[in-house]
Amino acid sequence: MQNILIVEDDMDIQELLREFLKEAGYEVMAANDGIEAMDLFEKNKFDLILLDVMLPKIDGFGVCELIRRQSQVPIIMLTALGGEEEQIRGLDLQVDDYITKPFSVPILIRKIAAVLRRSSQTQEEGHKTIEYQNLSLDL
């Protein structure tokens, strides 16, 4: 089962996301601020991070920057900041998608599935093995 980290300080939105993601078959953990997010990230393996921008302690851009220093785990930003400048900043930090609030839960669930599908295909392609006679080459 794939594991998703929700980083959202609005408890109503966090609970809504948690409920719908569990219903969709995902394991879910949640953080209320950037420091808690980094603590959970360092102690667990996540397949995807759903990240708000406006967070206490460390904002979502800062969290993304810290994560990208050590991992290419898929990140979807989910935020009320819908301006072009914020979206460009997120994309420059290599987020996989940038979704503005308010959002459609069914569309979000499908975008998460698409990002996870692409991520798993990339990982599978990265572990190819070529065999020739008695030689095996792990790519």
Question: What are the roles of these predicted feature ranges?
Answer:
Residues I130-L139:
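A structural micro-motif at secondary-structure boundaries
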Residues E125-K128:
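Short flexible loop/turn segments at helix-to-beta-strand junctions
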Residues M1-T122:
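N-terminal/domain-start alpha-helical segments
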